[in-house]
Amino acid sequence: MKPHFFYCIILLLSACRTIEVDPPAPEFIGLEEISSAKPSFLFIQTEMALKPYLKEADQSLDKKFTGKSEQCEGVSYTYHFERDPLLFKFKEKEVETTINGAFDLRLSYCPTCHELFGEERCAIPRIYASCGVDEPKRKVHVSYQSKIGISEDFVLRTKTQLGEFQLIDPCKITVFQYDASSTIEKEVKASLIQLEKEIDQQLAQAPIKSSVAEVWKTLQEPILVEPYGVFYLRPQTIGIADLTLKNEGQKAFFTTQLTAQPVFSTNTLDLDKVKLPQNTPQNTKEQKSILHLRTIASYDSINRFLIKDFDTQKISISPKKQIHINKVQILGPQADRLVLAIEFSGSKKGIFYLVAEPYIDIDQHLRMRKVDFEIKTKSMLLHSAKWLLDAKVKEQIEANLDVDLGPILKESQAAIEKQINGEISKGVWLNGNISELRVEQLQFSSSCFIIDFELSGLLKLKIQ
């Protein structure tokens, strides 16, 4: 009786013992072996109010001009010109500046001079005349054309030239048959031509560079997406294209073009900031922004999701043999698959190892397929618990290993949209929306998943 009893005890202990398999060593796959994400392009429809700077230009420019020409023989004159406020009209890439003004002119005429005591004197008393003195001043209409562009260093560049000059009220002196209109035009034009450079200098004060620099700085700041990780836009180049002017509201409209290498990481990354580069516009008519977002998820972070979301799975192999899958953890890569550590209990307990190919399904879930036993595990189970190699184990793990990426994607989208909506600096507002998000590819290294997503939407920038 005793031998039979001890034999049963040995069988029972053998059936319940822990299965021990040496964990496989994951292969090393460095990040440098991971293919680069596609470049991202952002097209920000930008609106900038120029009216405040035009008003400043008007207030800073001279309003009164005086000139004279004195000689003994012939006509001498003194003039005073005073302008009204500047009127600006926008048309595509030009600003037309209109000036209405009025002048008065004092003249004297000497038909001939002779020298007396070493000094030239008029031979007869000088004849005096005037226009716009003790009477309404004579009116003048002047216009300038300014061609506008944006320089490599984001300064508003204008090329202003005097266009139309019209004496509405000519000045003709009948007493000595002299038409002063050409003289006035010459003198007033000389003064007004000096305004060309001053108008250019004033328009260059529009704070395009400071606004662009502030936007550039803001877009380089990390965006915390709690509790999942951090988003980095990582802008690389910037350009301003398609500049056009609209008279209504006197605004400039242009497309701010950015290239970027965005990254989302479950861990904080130490990334260098990029200085504001030169203005380098791209030759494209695209208006929709497309982000190719690289998401770096460490295995530790994915394993935390697995611990949180994975429910214990019961697998019945036969009426007397069953196991409970208690925990699944990712160890790292092996060829084109990942090694999974499976902690189980039941008729047997312990840890065995599977290999599986990760993929992301159409519902944005991280799943596993082509699940199989790792070679060391298979060898061990063939000798100690062959029944565990049943296909049900692989099938149920494949069916139930599921990490929903939807929440992290929605939180990321919401955090990004929050960051791109609002006043980013005084008088500068950015707003936009993300209309589409889809998975592009999945890769993995020794320490993390690399998931590339494509996001698309529209962005707008408003500068007061």
Please tell me what each predicted stretch does.
Residues 17-464:
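Extracellular/lumenal and peripheral-membrane lipid-interaction modules
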Residues 9-10, 65:
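Residue-level signal for mature regions of secreted extracellular proteins and peptides
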Residues 2-9:
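Sec-dependent signal peptide recognition
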Residues 10-11, 142:
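Generic signature of intrinsically disordered, low-complexity, basic-rich segments
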Residues 13-15:
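C-terminal motif of bacterial Sec signal peptides marking the signal peptidase cleavage site
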